[in-house]
Amino acid sequence: MTGNLVTKNSLTPDVRNGIDFKIADLSLADFGRKELRIAEHEMPGLMSLRREYAEVQPLKGARISGSLHMTVQTAVLIETLTALGAEVRWASCNIFSTQDHAAAAVVVGPHGTPDEPKGVPVFAWKGETLEEYWWAAEQMLTWPDPDKPANMILDDGGDATMLVLRGMQYEKAGVVPPAEEDDPAEWKIFLNLLRTRFETDKDKWTKIAESVKGVTEETTTGVLRLYQFAAAGDLAFPAINVNDSVTKSKFDNKYGTRHSLIDGINRGTDALIGGKKVLICGYGDVGKGCAEAMKGQGARVSVTEIDPINALQAMMEGFDVVTVEEAIGDADIVVTATGNKDIIMLEHIKAMKDHAILGNIGHFDNEIDMAGLERSGATRVNVKPQVDLWTFGDTGRSIIVLSEGRLLNLGNATGHPSFVMSNSFANQTIAQIELWTKNDEYDNEVYRLPKHLDEKVARIHVEALGGHLTKLTKEQAEYLGVDVEGPYKPDHYRY
């Protein structure tokens, strides 16, 4: 037997050759391995770290629970972590972002077969329900030996961290609070999972929290959660904010989005972008990548912003700065990229053009009022996976919604390209090494990687692209007040 097809009613882990997992189809492993080998060539940061640390094995003893999009690029990250000595369990951080062949390749491993896998436990498949998503998250955090729980977390969006910290908080309170009637459906599912587990294990999450040495967080939304936990005094372990490393936020967030937004819209709709009116909600690093991508396709781009500095940047690049209410009725394509909630509400959706395209590229699905749309009485026709046509009976107008309001670049396409993810994942690997090997130097606060490590990641990728850096003379370095080998900029420098 080589397949392992997931069905809705099969939420128990599969076990083969001592590895527990739940993925779509193990027989996809060979395809996944071929793509993984190509990705390795495009990810010089991770491959350089493998070579640098192969003998030292700095992550030996680390049991990393990872919650991050289960893509081909993430597969290279996972196998980098294991190459440096870590044990790993994995789940995706989004119900639509898993690439099933990548998940299969990771479970089978480079030296296994579908019948005899020798890789890493993965609990992820494309098209999970929310119940399945949170089940998979719990499996990722539940190690086989209860005396050896997870001792590191690698997170994207903060769901794994939230599961542990909220679980511990409710265990200490002795009760999981009831959901309110108007709570989002996902929050109700989350609380139900914790309540069910509390009935059988009163201190599961407390034990995990006490074991974890630290968390490294990939994205803007997850970092916001970390700072909120820290401000409330609820952060139980040190955290490194990988997102705000320059070689992450200024590259993955902007240049990765510039590539993958167009890919997602093209695969989802095949609509011509040139000449169309496009509204980008938010002009942070992700929004800048979106606006630049659309402009490059010949679209007429407008931007919404709350921050006057970002708004002025947008205008200096030639974009109109408008409100949603001003622009929604004329827009052919609307993309949310704010990291905030309640950006495009039902009244906005109803005001959109017939067959306008609506999508989100922020981490969560609450930027677009999908719950309101579902309650509105509009009819939904699924055109193909992650593409839905919603039609309002009173007006007859239809709206094309991508990936149910979740990340369209991962739901409708394959996410950011390998080279830019090499920057981000090199930072993740370095951050894991930093927290694991120097844990006594960190308090339960949120930190950023030091500048010299950011520059190290950049240097690797400049060389991979054939660039040649100018070297300071000793006299020049003294004049600038820096070391010849860097760091070259103060921490407050904005690039």
UniProtKB/Swiss-Prot annotation:
GO CC annotations, alphabetized: cytosol
Entry binding sites for NAD(+): 219-221, 253, 282-287, 305, 340, 361-363, 409
Cofactor field: NAD(+)
Reactions catalysed according to its record: S-adenosyl-L-homocysteine + H2O = L-homocysteine + adenosine
Any Gene Ontology biological process: L-homocysteine biosynthetic process
Keywords in alphabetical order: Cytoplasm, Hydrolase, NAD, One-carbon metabolism
Record-linked PROSITE patterns: ADOHCYASE_1, ADOHCYASE_2
Cofactor note: Binds 1 NAD(+) per subunit.
GO molecular function: adenosylhomocysteinase activity
SMART domains reported in the protein's UniProt record: AdoHcyase (SM00996), AdoHcyase_NAD (SM00997)
Compartments (UniProt record): Cytoplasm
Gene3D superfamilies xrefs: Adenosylhomocysteinase-like, NAD(P)-binding Rossmann-like Domain
Assigned EC number: 3.13.2.1
Keyword Metal-binding found: no
Protein residues bound to substrate: T71, D156, E218, K248, D252
Pathway: Amino-acid biosynthesis; L-homocysteine biosynthesis; L-homocysteine from S-adenosyl-L-homocysteine: step 1/1
Described purpose of this protein according to its UniProt entry: May play a key role in the regulation of the intracellular concentration of adenosylhomocysteine.
Family recorded in the similarity comment: Belongs to the adenosylhomocysteinase family.
The protein's name: Adenosylhomocysteinase
Source organism per UniProt: Mycobacterium bovis (strain ATCC BAA-935 / AF2122/97)
